[in-house]
UniProtKB/Swiss-Prot annotation:
Keyword Magnesium: yes
Lineage per the UniProt record: Bacteria, Bacillati, Actinomycetota, Actinomycetes, Micrococcales
GO biological process, one term: isoleucine biosynthetic process
Ranges of residues in domain KARI N-terminal Rossmann: 6-186
InterPro entries per UniProt: 6-PGluconate_DH-like_C_sf (IPR008927), KARI (IPR013023), KARI_C (IPR000506), KARI_N (IPR013116), KARI_prok (IPR014359), NAD(P)-bd_dom_sf (IPR036291)
Protein name (database record): Ketol-acid reductoisomerase (NADP(+))
Sites where the protein binds substrate: 256
Family: Belongs to the ketol-acid reductoisomerase family.
Organism field: Tropheryma whipplei (strain Twist)
Gene Ontology molecular function terms on file: ketol-acid reductoisomerase activity; magnesium ion binding; NADP binding
């Protein structure tokens, strides 16, 4: 048990033979799909890949030595189906290829709880529904496995039809290498809501907006765009690495006294109580399903809003400056 009372499960807590004794169909061969499939195979698990006939990933999966079937064929053949296509595509893939090929005793696994949490997918009775969600992108999941390390994960049980779903989740987590680092049990609801909040308020949305505003403030005050880029974006990795290694305290210990003092007196003025209130509103939209409904509605109508927002973000001046600088310096090659 950890000091905060949350149990961290490691390799000694899992029986790898459970996942080795079933056929796993990995549906999708993108970031998580390719990493989890390769790691499972290297752990002695029988894996087939399910991809549409026109999928751009078919050749990559075949070149990696996998048997590649159509999604419905893979789902019918396997006892555990790992659905690793992007969230917006999962409903259609489930309805067209998986739903009618599930048998009692099968297991349906996700690496994000979005479609279960918001009711876009409702698996039938008699089927285990579980989640193993690595806390890192696919290339990291694969790289850490090959380096005899692991990427931490969370896991959850939504429906334990077989009575062995908990053990199966841990076995799968061990198969992809996650238990080398450790896994924490959660729920589909907790994983989905906290993951979306982290992405929107801090890791992606909040951080990107903070970087852009910092860049704009310096450039509008007359400083060189290149210098502004270094100060508010490039050096961010140095700080993030310190935080990941040893928490906020290691970052504070490692920076200069000037920087540390400035962070205390100025940080709360930038990220003030109004920011926290806005964060609470965002969390409320996530918990109520408002965000999910907006996202899926836009996706279903052609992703017009998403496309427009992506194009606007790509036109920000920091992108051109960054591309030019990265082309000049050896650290980007």
């Amino acid at each position: 048990m950890s000091e905060i009372g949350t149990r961290v499960y490691t390799e000694c807590d899992a029986d790898l033979s459970l996942i080795q004794n079933v056929l796993v169909a990995v549906i999708g061969y993108g970031s998580q799909g390719h990493a989890q499939a390769l790691n499972l195979r290297d752990s002695g698990v029988n894996v087939v890949i399910g991809l549409k006939e026109n999928s751009a990933s078919r050749k990559s999966a075949q070149d990696s030595g996998f048997e590649v079937l159509l999604p419905q064929e893979a789902a019918k053949k396997a006892q555990l189906i790992s659905l690793l296509v992007p969230d917006p595509a999962q409903r259609d893939v489930y309805e067209s290829a998986i739903k009618h090929n599930l048998s009692e005793g099968d297991a349906l696994l996700f690496s994000h709880g979005f479609n279960i949490r918001y009711g876009y997918i409702t698996p039938p009775d008699g089927v285990d529904v579980l989640m193993v969600a690595p806390k890192g992108p696919g290339h990291m999941v694969r790289r850490e496995y090959l380096d005899n390390r692991g990427t931490p994960a969370v896991f959850a049980i939504e429906k334990d039809a077989s009575g062995r779903c908990f053990d199966l989740a841990l076995s799968y987590a061990k198969g992809i290498g996650a238990l080398r680092a450790g896994a924490i049990q959660t729920t589909f609801t907790e994983e989905t809501e906290t993951d979306l909040f982290g992405e929107q308020a801090v890791l992606c949305g909040g951080l990107e907006q903070l970087i852009q505003y910092g860049y704009e403030t310096l450039v509008e005050a007359g400083y060189q765009p290149e210098v502004a880029y270094f100060e508010v974006l490039h050096e961010l990795k140095l700080i993030i690495d310190l935080i990941v290694e040893g928490g906020l305290s290691k970052s504070r210990w490692s920076i200069s006294d000037t920087a540390e003092y400035g962070s205390y007196v100025s940080g709360p003025r930038v990220i003030d109580k109004h920011v926290k209130e806005n964060m609470k509103k965002i969390l409320g939209e996530i918990r109520s399903g408002e965000f999910a409904n907006r996202f899926i509605k836009d996706q279903d109508s052609g992703a017009n809003e998403f496309t427009q927002l992506r194009e606007i973000a790509a036109r920000h001046p920091i992108e051109e400056v960054g591309a030019r600088l990265r082309a000049l310096f050896s650290w980007s090659k």
